[in-house]
Amino acid sequence: MSTFALIPAAGSGSRAPGERPKQYAALAGRPMLWHAVRAVCVPPVERAFVVLAPDDAHFAAEDWSAFGERLEPLWCGGQSRRESVYNGLVASRDQWDADDWVLVHDAARPCLPAQDLQALIAECSADAIGGILALPVADTVKKAAKDESGRHRILATEDRAQLWLAQTPQMFRAGLLVQALQRARGAVTDEAAALEQLGLKPRLVAGSRENIKVTWTEDLAMAESILTRRGESIR
């Protein structure tokens, strides 16, 4: 039984404008994707697959030599995260067993702390289903709807005691995840949602606020600050 990582990186990153896809944005001297790969290319993870768009011309222009044979690009990305993860698992099927663990990690999470990754692996390795890194919601959460003029109005206040913010990596048995993604219906924005549709209840492992997802342009400065403080900036 082994552990491998898979990073879906076929998106265009439309909310973080620029000439290059968001995952290749410069961050602490490297592309953001490089930092995401570095975060998961550590023991016990034996290999990392990066799922790219079929027409991706940026990956080959970057230096990935630090990862050696542990990193393998797959040009089989789909139109959605679900398609990209599923396609990546199918394309790499001859390199893993159904009981192996797969860690699916966002290309836009370059600041994953090492202790968060190790906590996830330690707490989920003996779990029958697997689980995800997540944060308990600290802010008050409002449910909203638009009024007749298009302005957002509060409908209700949600019980934040039951709410968590999903992060990555998300860790599941590879065979089970393929089955879940294959059967999933409707909008599936993360792997846990596909498992939920099978009636399963993945575990929640508390992560940290440093594991930010770079979504907006201003998030890049925050990620840069985190990496620089850790001494992971390359100049």
Predicted regions span which residues?
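Short aromatic-hydrophobic micro-motifs that form the base-stacking/packing surface
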Residues: 101-105
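Conserved core of the sugar-phosphate nucleotidyltransferase
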Residues: 112-205, 235
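Generic C-terminal helix-cap and adjacent flexible tail
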Residues: 94-98, 146-149, 226-235
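Conserved active-site beta-strand element of glycosyltransferases/polysaccharide synthases
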Residues: 202-206, 212-215
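N-terminal glycine-rich phosphate-binding loop and ensuing alpha1 helix
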Residues: 1-57, 71
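Short phosphate-binding loop-to-helix
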Residues: 65-100
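SAM-dependent methyltransferases
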Residues: 1-4, 190-192, 209, 220-235
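Acidic helix N-cap motif at the loop->helix transition within catalytic regions
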Residues: 57-63
